[in-house]
Design a protein with these regions (language model features):
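Intrinsically disordered, metal-sensing/regulatory segments
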Residues: 1-259
Length: 259
């Protein structure tokens, strides 16, 4: 039980660590560092989606022959569609822009930025929950060590994400503690989402291949719709490409070595 609780909380600790950068770094993050971190986060999320979610989803349906890919394909598309719907309905603001997206709202920029990060973190929490549910069920090739590897990978990805949230908020005039708290709270949805998936695991077990792919699709949506455009826009895009490669390889190694 303690291993499970620790696994669910590790990603939140990564967000808190990144948010704490606001205490010992200058108020504004350099464009070079921000591009590198965005690319790194993208690489980790893509690798986790492929190695820890999509491949296990297809392996669970190996007895279906050529149709083994069907649950993974359906779940992936549903995951992307779900995040697209949430993105359209929820008022939010992306980093580096003053143009709100989603439904019209009178929320402050700080609140809309926090909502954007919550949308981002939701699929990551689902991914952690579903891999732990898969490891606990014994119905997949996902081991407990493999589930912890996913949790660690997302935590590593959350370190730059926490910094990318807290430091611009500090630069906008918020206090260091307020910037740290909002950055940290943006990651609270991850353990909550993971816990909900695990609590419902017994009911959802027949649909586990779909859920694994659903989480992968949702994570891919965040990467394609948010992270890659922000990483590629403007100067220093080569740094984001290098960061992507490093993040992808790191997550791949974690999954293979620990899985």
């Amino acid at each position: 039980m303690m291993t499970l609780i620790t696994g669910l909380l590790i990603p939140l600790l990564g967000t808190m660590l990144g948010s704490a950068f606001v205490f010992f770094m200058k108020d504004e993050m350099s464009p070079r560092l921000q591009k590198s971190l965005l690319g790194f986060a993208s690489g980790v999320m893509v690798a986790a989606s492929v190695w820890s979610l999509l491949i296990p989803a297809m392996e669970m349906e190996a007895d279906s022959g050529k149709w083994a890919v069907a649950p993974a394909a359906i779940g992936f598309l549903l995951g992307m569609g779900f995040l697209l719907l949430i993105d359209e309905l929820t008022p939010h603001l992306h980093i580096g822009t003053d143009k709100p997206e989603g439904m019209r709202s009178h929320l402050s920029k700080t609140a809309m930025l926090a909502l954007a990060v919550t949308i981002h973190n939701l699929p990551e929490g689902m991914a952690v929950g579903v891999v732990f549910a898969g490891a606990d069920s014994g119905a997949t090739n996902i081991s407990l060590a493999g589930a912890i590897a996913v949790s660690l990978g997302i935590a590593i990805q959350n370190v730059p994400e926490g910094a990318i949230i807290s430091m611009p908020m500090r630069a906008a005039g918020n206090s260091r503690w307020r910037s740290f708290m909002i950055g940290s709270l943006s990651g609270a949805v991850e353990p909550l989402g993971a816990a909900c998936v695990i609590l419902l695991a017994s009911l959802l077990m027949p649909a586990l291949p779909y859920l694994l792919a659903f989480a992968a699709g949702a994570m891919f949506y965040v990467v394609v719709e948010e992270l890659i455009p922000e990483a590629s826009n403007g100067q220093h895009s080569n740094l984001s490409t290098i960061g992507f490669a490093v993040g992808f390889v790191l997550m791949m190694v974690l999954d293979v070595v620990m899985g």
